[in-house]
Swiss-Prot record:
Repression domain 1 (RD1) is involved in transcriptional repression. RD1 is necessary for its interaction with PML. The gene is TBX2. This is T-box transcription factor TBX2. It comes from Homo sapiens (Human). InterPro entries: p53-like_TF_DNA-bd_sf, T-box_DNA-bd, T-box_sf, TBX2/3_TAD, TBX2_3_RD, TF_Brachyury, TF_T-box, TF_T-box_CS. Pfam families: T-box, TBX2-3_RD, TBX2-3_TAD. The lineage of its organism: Eukaryota, Metazoa, Chordata, Craniata, Vertebrata. Residues 109-287 bind DNA.
Length: 712
């Protein structure tokens, strides 16, 4: 750090011409070497000498004057903080002695009472390698200065005695002789020089002064020894330039209550407490550990506990309601197959919901429990007038179904289709009759109109679905045929309900077909539903066999009728959905779209769909994967339904079929093999046609259903 000083010394001996001002003053070199500080810089003789106009006398006079000034002052000047720009040229007048000014400065210590409190206990100041500010900060108020004269205010810290200290028995005592002193540094107030009027206008604070124990510090911090006592000193110098400090008159003021012992960690707990009580930045010593953020967190914890305690009984009540008050899904009144088209009947579901009075939060869990246990033990009765009526043994089985639905993995001992053999013969006999009934019932069964439910509470019916999965086939297609008028369709995060028969009418069959992806053949009846349950997923394959509303929880999504690229399954669920709810949602999306069609769906095709058990990579809801694959690239126009239809008729087939149920889901037919391949392709291509054309396409093709449904 002495190179700039040597350069400046050489300039001091350079002959200056009288008419020309000084080329570069001393401060220019110092600023170039250290922009903000003058760290421990001992100015050499001649560096601060005033240039003389006579070139011949410049060398000797400068050397003599500088030597005398340095001997008198004996100061090592250091500056911390910004000072006026020094690169500009200065005239010689800036270094001329000032006229005599009459002043009588008076200095008072700010926050004297706080200093006294610390002083009584023995003030401690922490020093660190990176530098630490003082607390209380050294702040004084000055009066009696000349308003027009310029003053430089400085501060330094000197050793108070020649001793080293230690804290023992709750008090400070001398521990030995002091260590060698560190380099002395003076802290020049950043506002210096300034007029007396400016200094007297407000307290003069040296709060930016930092203490360090780093001997090689290059930031201009004051270097101190730990466990030594120090005394701050305040200086007033009347000068209009910092370079005049060495030969200016210093007025020094000492406040005994400001002495302190430098420490690397606080020794006296009382001092620590005083700092905590008075210093808003003493975050490292608070009880909370790390300052205001943790303190704020601690303050919020009681309110969080109160909130949790307040919500706990509600959650407990909701869980008990979900387990005890929810009606079994099959108790919902089914729509008569021969009834005329009518809106969805939600009165019983709403009444049961009001009686339960459950909170809306556990709805996904309640839906999953209902739908997971709904199909277990259900099989359509032979009675043609009411195909979904249950016998008493089946009702008894259904009462036990929620418990079985909650634990799908525990029932896996019989294999994915382990329970099918118990009901196989009876279900196959029923299917032959049901296939004939469906052709006649499909003509009588109308299509239930679309009902948008605006009630915030959701009816907990068997056909409920916590989310609808849209496949990648929908990119660029219209969402709903009847609603495709070019306007966006905004769905409330509550329920969007429609009758099960409305899907084929609205061109929604391709949605369900693409969700289904493919299907296995297999025996019908409750055995297959339980078999899928044993496969690790709580299914609700026959959940929509009644005319219960079909809700879509499309929360936080705006679906435009022009068609928005939809994510695959799970993307439209409310975020915290369970695996059980997702599986039930998939199963609820699969059933055929009329009440009579759903009866046969309960018997066979839907509950055996490999959609729930397949290892389809993009369906992330299945925690238990069965090695049955479905090509994700399967197209809606895939043909080959003739061979797949024969597979669908086979009761024990577990082979994947690309799209045997495609057209069936699309047009609303309930059973496999109901359509010819050409009919399926035609309906897939014309999926957005009117309701009449779709229904009329069924009438000519359902005659094939009984023959192809028979097991091989």
């Amino acid at each position: 750090m002495r190179e700039p000083a040597l350069a400046a010394s050489a300039m001091a001996y350079h002959p200056f011409h009288a008419p020309r001002p000084a080329d570069f003053p001393m401060s220019a070199f110092l600023a170039a070497a250290q922009p903000s500080f003058f760290p421990a810089l001992a100015l050499p003789p001649g560096a601060l000498a005033k240039p003389l106009p006579d070139p011949g006398l410049a060398g000797a006079a400068a050397a003599a004057a500088a030597a005398a000034a340095a001997a008198e002052a004996g100061l090592h000047v250091s500056a911390l903080g910004p000072h006026p720009p020094a690169a500009h040229l200065r005239s010689l007048k800036s270094l001329e002695p000032e006229d005599e000014v009459e002043d009588d400065p008076k200095v008072t210590l700010e926050a004297k009472e706080l200093w006294d409190q610390f002083h009584k206990l023995g003030t401690e100041m922490v020093i660190t390698k990176s530098g630490r500010r003082m607390f209380p900060p050294f702040k004084v108020r000055v009066s009696g200065l000349d308003k027009k004269a310029k003053y430089i205010l400085l501060m330094d810290i000197v050793a108070a005695d020649d001793c080293r200290y230690k804290f023992h028995n709750s008090r400070w005592m001398v521990a030995g002789k002091a260590d060698p002193e560190m380099p002395k540094r003076m802290y020049i107030h950043p506002d210096s020089p300034a007029t007396g009027e400016q200094w007297m206008a407000k307290p003069v604070a040296f709060h930016k002064l930092k203490l360090t124990n780093n001997i090689s510090d290059k930031h201009g911090f004051t270097i101190l020894n730990s466990m030594h006592k120090y005394q701050p000193r305040f200086h007033i110098v009347r000068a209009n330039d910092i370079l005049k400090l060495p030969y200016s008159t210093f007025r020094t003021y000492v406040f005994p209550e400001t002495d302190f012992i430098a420490v690397t960690a606080y020794q006296n707990d009382k001092i620590t407490q005083l700092k905590i009580d008075n210093n808003p930045f003493a975050k490292g010593f608070r009880d909370t550990g790390n300052g205001r953020r943790e303190k704020r967190k601690q303050l919020t914890l009681p309110s969080l506990r109160l909130y949790e305690e307040h919500c706990k009984p509600e959650r407990d009540g909701a869980e008990s309601d979900a387990s005890s008050c929810d009606p079994p899904p099959a108790r919902e009144p089914p729509t008569s197959p021969g009834a005329a088209p009518s809106p969805l009947r939600l009165h019983r579901a709403r009444a049961e919901e009001k009686s339960c009075a459950a909170d809306s939060d556990p709805e996904p869990e309640r839906l999953s429990e209902e739908r997971a246990g709904a199909p277990l033990g259900r099989s359509p009765a032979p009675d043609s007038a009411s195909p979904t009526r249950l016998t008493e043994p089946e009702r008894a089985r259904e009462r036990r179904s929620p418990e079985r639905g909650k634990e799908p993995a525990e029932s896996g001992g019989d294999g994915p289709f382990g329970l099918r053999s118990l009901e196989k013969e009876r279900a196959e006999a029923r299917r032959k009759d049901e296939g004939r009934k469906e052709a006649a019932e499909g003509k009588e069964q109308g299509l239930a109109p679309l009902v948008v439910q605006t009630d915030s509470a959701s009816p907990l019916g068997a056909g409920h679905l916590p989310g609808l999965a849209f496949s990648s086939h929908l990119h660029g297609q219209q969402f709903f045929g009847p609603l495709g008028a070019g306007q966006p369709l905004f769905l409330h995060p509550g329920q969007f309900t429609m009758g099960p028969g409305a899907f084929s009418a609205m061109g929604m069959g391709h949605l369900l077909a693409s969700v289904a992806g493919g299907g296995n053949g297999g025996g019908g009846g409750p055995g297959t539903a339980a078999g899928l349950d044993a496969g690790g997923l709580g299914p609700a394959a026959s959940a929509a066999s009644t005319a219960a509303p079909f809700p879509f929880h499309l929360s936080q999504h705006m679906l435009a009728s022009q068609g928005i690229p939809m994510p695959t399954f799970g993307g439209l669920f409310p975020y915290p959905y369970t695996y059980m709810a997702a599986a039930a949602a998939a199963a609820s999306a699969l059933p055929a779209t009329s009440a009579a069609a759903a009866a046969a769906a309960a018997a066979g095709s839907l509950s055996r769909s490999p959609f729930l058990g397949s290892a389809r990579p993009r369906l992330r809801f299945s925690p238990y994967q069965i090695p049955v694959t479905i090509p994700p690239s399967t197209s809606l126009l895939t043909t080959g339904l003739a061979s797949e239809g024969s597979k669908a008729a086979g009761g024990n087939s577990r082979e994947p079929s690309p799209l045997p149920e495609l057209a069936l889901r699309k047009v609303g037919a309930p059973s496999r093999g109901a359509l010819s391949p050409s009919g399926s392709a035609k309906e897939a291509a014309n999926e957005l046609q009117s309701i009449q054309r779709l229904v009329s396409g069924l009438e000519s093709q359902r005659a094939l259903s009984p023959g192809r449904e028979s097991p091989k």
